[in-house]
Amino acid sequence: MKMPVHLNALRAFEASARHQSFSAAAAELNVTPAAVGQLVRSLEDWLGTPLFHRASSGRVRLVATEAAEHALPDIRAGFDRLSLGLERLKEESNGGVLTVTVSPAFAAKWLLPRIESFHAAWPDMDVRLDTNLRTVDFLAQRIDIGVRYGPGSWPGLVAEKLMDEEVYPVCSPKLLMDTARLQTPDDLARETLIHDLSMDSHMDFPTWAAWVGKLGLAGVATSRGMKINNSAAVLQAAIDGQGVALARSVMARDDLAAGRLVRLFPQIRFESPLAYYVVYRPGCSSLPRLMAFRDWLFETAAK
């Protein structure tokens, strides 16, 4: 049986199945929901079988049929191979665009202050940063490589540990102009605690409650204080003297070195169970452009 050209229809089907929504698939593919629905219906007509169970009400309106679910891994693998083939064509030249996904805070506090050295080594390569807290689909969003913070396991991606992390209290030097202030951890009971909520939903993400609990500080109320969902903004609030932040060492490194922040109680160690990982799709390790950035990340992190 001759295979007709149905790549757009297959892409619409795969995205609709992943999102369980024509509207969400349309947003990803930059077309209208009606166009996605038409592409899926054309594929169903050609196959002679429905690909989705459609509901008129409820939270999920679109569920792939059993046959469609069985076919999806092969279809996704096929798109991955096509994407990799295009990447190999790009490698005919050292130029092009490398798309890198990182969190907004990691971009601001670690990557951007250091990336000039990568541009100096690879002047013909442009880097496009996709800053996002959510877990993006590398294939659908055309992501080449990224740095993720977490336990080190993400389906469909190679993950190589880049950096471990420690957490500790920090504050502005101006808070310590009163020499009697913040002499012991118990003194935190009289300070505004700045909370990092950027990964609050992850049970292993270090929090003030975990840090205070480890020390058994009964008088420190960890439910109060300033709550911010961006690690860079957490540090900026501390720099501005708004209170004491529980800083992530990778994010706070430059601010500590520049004297904008001071680490409190350095004798207390609290290692995060999470770490930073370089992530990319399997099979991409042979792409020189991508591996150049990967190697630069590891060389820079080791300094």
Which residues make up each language-model segment?
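Short helix-boundary/capping micro-motifs
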Residues: A15-N30
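A short LG(V/I)-centered, amphipathic sequence patch enriched
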Residues: E44-A64, L261
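Residues within the DNA-recognition helix of helix-turn-helix
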Residues: T32-A35, L39-S42, R114
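Short helix-loop hinge/linker segments at domain boundaries
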Residues: A55-L62, E69, F79-T101
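C-terminal regulatory
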Residues: A140, W154-E271, A302-K303
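Helix-turn-helix DNA-binding elements, focusing on the entry/boundary residues of the two helices
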Residues: S21-F22, V40, R54, V234
